[in-house]
């Protein structure tokens, strides 16, 4: 079993980033709800847990009814790192004082490190004229610790937060008011690596080659000689899941690829070629375009479209799965963020922005056991796994594509005509991004953007082509840059590139005479339009 770190989640929007940073240090980490009981914590320690991290929260640590850290966390003898709310809870439960701050801090701050602690010693972004080491960090808090618990010493401070970090090194307890997990905290990654390796004693035994060997053995043991079916979408997650399961059990796996008529240009052909010709995976290809388009006729509401597409996918998949009499397992490309979000939804601590298109309702309907070989991995780890399994890099590293496909990139009602126009416009945009290089970085603009796509707007505008007047549709281009997809900035594509894309779309896609570029960031906008 791998050495691991337990992360207790108190509702922060960036808790997943803590786990990702820990794994980037080569250490396995798991996120669990912050209200687990003492028995759970003790059991984790008995299984070799090396340390605990307490996340931030939107809640107030001193308000009645706020979530408390399990008492066992502080008496099982493993190092603990509290972040933001985690620091306040640690202080309050160990005898310190937490108060509401008259000066709330949200955003960039400069923190002065105090004393010499294992966590911060030698880390600095710049030094003041007086010789004080300073850290550039990201703050997001309204409460603050105003009195240290017994045994703790001051570790960091800001002008408005005299206690921005504290430590009881004899017990391995550390806490910071800022967020080391976000990229805005320049030394944050180094801090978390130092905590898990130098303080918790983890050796960094989490790596992809070992994961593949363990996952293959686990799948073989779990499945035995049974047949497995998998809904293959062509997306990264289901593709990597298929490759991993096929590595483990070969022809015991059958993939069902449902074409709902809302895929990108030639996507169906590419999926079939990759898996059948190059990897020898058994695939049942179902063209259900007419069924999906028929159900979407007259439907304009985006949430209604998502639900219809999800429901019809289940129906088509169920019909095909029923023909595979020997199948006892349903495989899904569930990844770790899906697991975390599902847990949050069940506890009522998560807010639903958009419904997710998946096959989550299938196990009960089909009476199949569930196989989720990627449920421990984040997206970047899934991509790394895909490359290690031999999937083409252009498939593994391509931009995310929503389950409902072009159905949520066509605003309003979905029509076959609209899908054809959008497919061709989108293909031109992506082709030009792949061909255009940024001289400064040497990377293509496709590599420099995290997600890029075209959106069909069901409105017409007047134009002129040759000597004639046109009255045709509008397409919007969307390209964003992001580290985590929780926030995103619109990509500053070069004007000549945008001009070339626009010219090609208008000249090559008859029916479109205007192209616009979306310069909205997330928030307030979401990345997808629907």
Curated annotation (Swiss-Prot):
Q: Write down the top EC class of this protein.
A: ligase
Domain Glutamine amidotransferase type-1: start-end pairs? 4-205
CDD domains for this protein: GATase1_GMP_Synthase, GMP_synthase_C
Q: Which GO terms describe its cellular component?
A: cytosol
Q: Which residues form the GMPS ATP-PPase domain?
A: 206-398
The pathway this protein participates in, as annotated, is: Purine metabolism; GMP biosynthesis; GMP from XMP (L-Gln route): step 1/1
User: Where do the TM regions start and end?
Assistant: none
What EC number(s) has UniProt assigned to this enzyme? 6.3.5.2
Q: Which positions are annotated as binding ATP?
A: 233-239
Identify which residues the record assigns to the active site: 84 (nucleophile), 179, 181
Q: A Gene Ontology molecular-function term?
A: ATP binding
Which Pfam family, giving just one, matches this sequence? GMP_synt_C
Q: Does the keyword Zinc apply?
A: no
Q: Which UniProt keywords apply?
A: ATP-binding, Glutamine amidotransferase, GMP biosynthesis, Ligase, Nucleotide-binding, Purine biosynthesis
So what does this thing catalyse? XMP + L-glutamine + ATP + H2O = GMP + L-glutamate + AMP + diphosphate + 2 H(+)
Q: Which HAMAP family match?
A: GMP_synthase
Describe its function.
Catalyzes the synthesis of GMP from XMP.
- Provide the assembly information: Homodimer.
PANTHER family, A to Z: GMP SYNTHASE [GLUTAMINE-HYDROLYZING], GMP SYNTHASE-RELATED
What is the name of the protein in this document? GMP synthase [glutamine-hydrolyzing]
Q: Taxonomic lineage of this organism? A: Bacteria, Pseudomonadati, Pseudomonadota, Betaproteobacteria, Burkholderiales
